[in-house]
Amino acid sequence: MRGASAFAEYWRIPELTARTKRGDWIVTGDKFFCDSHGYYHYCGRADDMLKVAGMWVSPAEVENSLLGHRDVAEAAVVGATDERGLAYSVAHVVLRGNVHGSEELAAEICEHVKTRLVSYKVPREVRFCRELPKTVTGKIQRFKLRGNARE
């Protein structure tokens, strides 16, 4: 992005300024795509993108699909690696109301995603939690979920 209101530099962090600024342009790390109608859609942050089965996966796209399930109140998707070092996605899900997590519900949620996205984007694992870790401003703390995915 660029414009008259763009920042000049990061205060006392010249390395970050050098990585972020390209002349008049600012590299935000946000990823978008333009559809056939000319509308732009947000895909998430570049540093949140996952490479699963050699293909890029946007956690935001998977999360939006998860949120379409009637029992899902909140969702966050992060990457994990298996014992062979292969990457896969893990969905952390907060359920609505008095719904309780089960293997059957996890399978149903994955089937729901499978009807909306290609197979490599379907989470290999669904973890149910009471709440997602968030900052005081409500942003999901993905680093905490990534740590949980390794356990």
Spans of model-derived segments:
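AMP-binding/adenylate-forming catalytic core of the ANL superfamily
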Residues: 3, 8-12, 16-19, 23, ...
